[in-house]
A protein has these predicted regions:
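N-terminal domain-onset segments
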Residues: 1-49
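Short, compact, well-ordered microdomains
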Residues: 50-85
Length: 85
C-alpha cells in the first residue's frame, strides 16, 4: 500500500499472521510457510541501512524511496503517515 508523509510517497505493509506471504514478497525473502505462522511472538528480520532489525507483529515495514527498508511501531506510523489514494 502507498502512504504519504510530508509529500513523500512510500510503500509500507503491516506485519500480521494473515499476510506473512505478502510481507515476505514485499521484502524479497522466501516464505517459510507454517514456521512463520506458528512463531510466538511473530517476528521477522528486516535488513535496514543500520543493519538487521526485527519487525514485531503489527509493526509496519516501510520501503524508502531508494528501496531501503525500515521498521516502525504502529502508533508512530499512524502519527506520521497517511494513506495515499
Amino acid at each position: 500500500m502507498k502512504f504519504r508523509r510530508e509529500g513523500i510517497v512510500i510503500d509500507a505493509i503491516q506485519l500480521n499472521r494473515g499476510n506473512i506471504a505478502k510481507v515476505c514478497d514485499f521484502l524479497g525473502i522466501p516464505d517459510m510457510g507454517n514456521s512463520w505462522r506458528t512463531m510466538n511472538p511473530l517476528r521477522i528480520d528486516v535488513e535496514t541501512p543500520e543493519g538487521t532489525t526485527k519487525a514485531n507483529e503489527l509493526d509496519w515495514i516501510i520501503r524508502g524511496v531508494e528501496g531501503e527498508y525500515y521498521t516502525c511501531e504502529p502508533d508512530i506510523f499512524e502519527q506520521n503517515y497517511e494513506k495515499e489514494d
